[in-house]
Design a protein with these regions (language model features):
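Helix-to-loop junctions at the C-terminal end of transmembrane segments
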Residues: 66-77, 294-307
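C-terminal transmembrane helical hairpin of 12-TM major facilitator-type secondary transporters
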Residues: 309-354
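C-terminal ends and interior cores of transmembrane alpha-helices
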Residues: 87-106, 316-332
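Glycine-rich segments within core transmembrane alpha-helices of 12-TM secondary carriers
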Residues: 146-170, 193, 375-387
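Cytoplasmic membrane-interface "Motif A"-like loop-to-helix N-cap segments
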Residues: 75-87, 304-316
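Extracytoplasmic gate region of multi-pass secondary transporters
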Residues: 29, 235-291, 383-388
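Extracellular/periplasmic helix-loop-helix junction of adjacent transmembrane segments
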Residues: 32-64
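A late C-terminal transmembrane helix in Major Facilitator Superfamily
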Residues: 365-397
Length: 478
């Protein structure tokens, strides 16, 4: 049984990394044009394109971070690696604000920006899967959906904070001030976020599941030598994880990364008539705020009706509502754009609210952080991080403004197929972990239920380390 105060601190410690990551994403996205003008030796659209290319660089290094830092978390502990990623992430973000402009540093300005993005990508590769694992292992079984959803509250909070700070600086600075020093200010806010994150993470012990695993064997150091091999033995679960990651994050980056530039494309197609750039930014902030408010409610619902049900609803919404949402967005009026983006956002948060509790349940404790980090980052880098790039290329090449809808439908189909193979983890212990409860009276009920289920499974000849699917099939027939 984990004390509620400890759980609250664990959630705060995990969420602060997400806030920092998405704060940087929001700031970099909003400041991309200015960064291109100041740091790149190119002009106009070429400088902007290069700036976005450097944004994509971070995705190329996320799998490397997942491969190295994920298994390291299974070896030395979740909280130690989370402290490391917090330092790297915040340090790289602050460093971007310190890069000299091209007029003073020449090509080295571009090189320094590249290196900062590499470090951000590497650290993020070890951050998110580990943070999901951290919260999932701390959370009581019957509240894991709600508490896991708070990790995504951190995501949307970070994006809103980054967008808001960038918009504030742009509003208060003249063009010359913005190009001289104003663009740097939002990046410096990552410094206090980093201090807070490291402090929170250093004050917590490791998760009960990891500590129990460590106590099981004096041969743990020897076992760690084959941990990466053992991790890849989980490839069926990693494929299910990858399918869910695609459905989730194609939608995520379609909304947060591509829609702002897509609205400008729609305006061009309509001969310059449509919402202003300022309203474009405001509409994104409104949608993020709406999603932020609803995410915990969906997480709470997933503890009542199951994760699979929520994920299935989100997948169906992508398939059925992709065209209606794009039709509203392409009308390009203030009300229609916000309505269309909110529809897309509601589809997104069916995944965002449930994935932090769903994905860790696919893997046993010994390889959980490693398998999750590797699968998550490989699939997000290969299929999701470039969503804006390939969607924009298809729209530009064909002139068809409905391409985002086609891609969202494909994402929904992938999600629907993946959820078919997803075991329901609602209210159950994580694979390889003891039951986690919040109160003593709950513990007595859990023990009674587990004894009854264990007797049924033993009678059916199901082994103790069998995956959920095998146990589910036996229990469903009884």
């Amino acid at each position: 049984m984990t004390h509620p105060d400890v759980i609250k601190r664990a959630i705060g410690a995990a969420a602060i990394g997400n806030i920092t990551e998405w704060y940087d994403f929001g700031v970099y996205s909003y400041m991309a044009l200015t960064i291109g003008d100041v740091i790149m030796p190119l002009e106009g659209s070429a400088a902007t394109l290069m700036t976005y290319a450097l944004m994509a660089v971070a995705f190329l290094f996320r799998p490397l971070g997942g491969i190295i830092l994920g298994p390291l978390s299974d070896r030395i502990g979740r909280n130690k690696v989370l402290a490391m990623t917090m330092i790297m992430m915040a340090g790289a973000t602050v460093a971007i604000g310190l890069i000299p402009d091209y007029a003073h540093a020449g090509i080295w300005a571009c090189v320094l920006l590249f290196l900062c993005r590499v470090l951000q990508g590497f650290s993020t590769g070890g951050e998110y899967g580990n943070a999901m694992t951290f919260i999932a292992e701390y959370a009581p079984d019957k509240k894991r959906g709600f508490l896991g959803s708070l990790l995504e509250v951190g995501t949307f909070t970070g994006y809103l904070l980054g967008a808001g700070m960038s918009a504030l600086v742009m509003a208060l600075c003249t063009t010359d001030q913005l190009h001289s020093w104003g663009w740097r200010l939002p990046f410096f806010l990552a410094l206090p976020l980093g201090f807070i994150g490291v402090y929170l993470r250093s004050k917590l012990g490791d998760t009960p599941a990891f500590e129990a695993l460590e106590a099981e064997s004096e041969q743990r150091e020897k076992d760690n030598k084959v941990s990466l091999k053992d991790t890849f033995k989980m490839w069926p679960a990693m494929l299910v994880c990858g399918g869910l990651v695609i459905a989730w994050n194609v939608t995520n980056y379609m909304l947060t990364a591509y829609m702002p530039s897509f609205l400008s494309t729609v305006t061009d197609h309509k001969g310059g008539q449509g919402i202003s750039d300022n309203m474009n930014n405001v509409s994104q902030i409104i949608v993020m705020a709406v999603c932020l408010a609803i995410i915990p409610l969906i997480g709470l619902a997933s503890d009542r009706i199951g994760r699979k049900t929520i994920v299935r609803i989100g997948s169906v919404m992508l398939i059925v509502l992709a065209f209606p949402s794009l039709m509203l967005i392409t009308r390009n009026t203030e009300g229609s754009v916000i309505a269309g983006l909110i529809i897309m956002g509601l589809s997104l948060i069916c995944f965002s609210a449930t994935m932090p509790s769903t994905l860790p349940s696919l893997f046993p404790t010994a390889v959980r952080a490693g398998a999750l980090s590797i699968a998550f980052n490989i699939f997000i880098s290969a299929f999701c991080g470039t969503t804006a790039l390939y969607t924009g290329a298809l729209v530009d090449a064909t002139g068809n403004l409905m391409w985002p809808a086609y891609i969202l439908i494909i994402a929904g189909v992938i999600g629907l197929v993946s959820v078919h193979f997803l075991p329901e983890s609602n209210g159950r212990p994580l694979w390889g972990s003891a039951p986690s409860v919040e109160h003593d009276h709950e513990a007595h009920g859990v023990v009674k239920d587990l004894h009854a289920e264990a007797d049924q499974l033993k009678a059916a000849g199901v082994r103790e380390d069998a995956p959920y699917e095998e146990a589910d099939e036996v229990l469903a027939k009884s």
